[in-house]
Amino acid sequence: MAAVVVELRSTGQPGRLSPHSSWRLPVSSTLHSRYLSLMQLKGCGTALVTPFRQDNSIDETALRNLVAWQIESGIDFLIPCGTTGETPTLSHDEWLYVIDVTIEVAAGRVPIVAGATSNSTHDAVEKAKEVAARPGVSAILTASPYYNKPTQEGQYRHFRAIAEAVDKPLILYNVPGRTGANLEPATLARLAEVPNIAGVKEASGNMTQIAEVCNAVPEQFLVFSGDDAVTLPVIALGGVGIISVASNEIPREMAEMTRAALNNDWDTARKLHRKYLPLMQANFIESNPLPVKAVLAMMGRIEEVYRLPLLPMRRDTRSKLQKIAIEVGLIARPAGASAEANDFYIYESWLAGPHKIVLHRSNCGQCNHGKGRPAGHDANHARWHGPYTTLSDARATAQQMTGVLIRSECKCI
């Protein structure tokens, strides 16, 4: 009889289990797709970024430091080589290298859920086999096939083929905004009965669908939110936690929020959610992982380097992101900026005469409460841009604007 390895070992840390290969569960057991819950894989897991150096090579030192910081901050499990890790830009060897470094640094202190996805079922199976062979991998995260848009039956057969090929549990990843293929609740309910398929990361962005998923799958099936902003409602519906982007930046806070919700301490959970919701939302002001890597660079934890086709953030969105990072206490206010006059705005007008723009400070007395709206503002003939955290950002943006005949700065500057 085939056996599925369930890796368990006490780490001395409450709520955490780590790899061990001494306990085996027959595939035919009624617990076949439920045993991951025995590992207490719940709470907040970080979908790790992959740090790069300026020469585009993997920054192993930054990766090691990031993994260590995550664990020291109380994160419950780690996911290397997912969407946030820019995995499509990694070579095959680099993909395994990132997973191996994460396993080595974690040293059994938290479970490792390794990403292994392909739009070819054959390749997805081979990748899953490679990571399943690593003793430090507790489970595999695998997304719906992207680009080729399989039917529901095609997705079912794809995931079942992977599950039947490996002896590690699978967490399925439904992210139709990326893959172009939505994994519907009825299909997921069928997959929940397949040996080795133990849970799902639900990132459909559709709360009605997530509610249907929670109702359709068995109680022991693990449902994770794939979106930080809806962690609490997903847990309220029966979910077991979050596979998080924001925990790259705020691991302790995301772990505390998630544990509070799981322990029915909703006052604490809501308090943390209210404070960090702007950051959770700002992490998607441009394509993930651009904002989260930008914030980590602002924090001094990584270099802000992406691989093509990804490019650094635009100045306007970076400025908004920086402002939020300051407000939630992740980074210090820029030198020389005061709390009363931290932001700058560009006011663009074409009501009369030449098209023109004027730079204003946020506390300018000539503007409407410093929002770049001088008296007599006409929304049909004017608009404002910003805020910009630094004057240099505002000036650079103004310089790049086209079709503007006159540029000037208010006396408040």
Protein language model features and the residues they cover:
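Ala/Thr-enriched low-complexity intrinsically disordered regions
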Residues: 2-3, 11, 30
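Active-site beta->alpha loop and helix N-cap motifs at the rims of alpha/beta catalytic domains
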Residues: 35-46, 51-180
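C-terminal alpha-helical cap/extension of soluble enzyme domains
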Residues: 36, 40, 45-51, 73-75, ...
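Catalytic alpha/beta core domains of metabolic enzymes, predominantly
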Residues: 164-165, 178-284
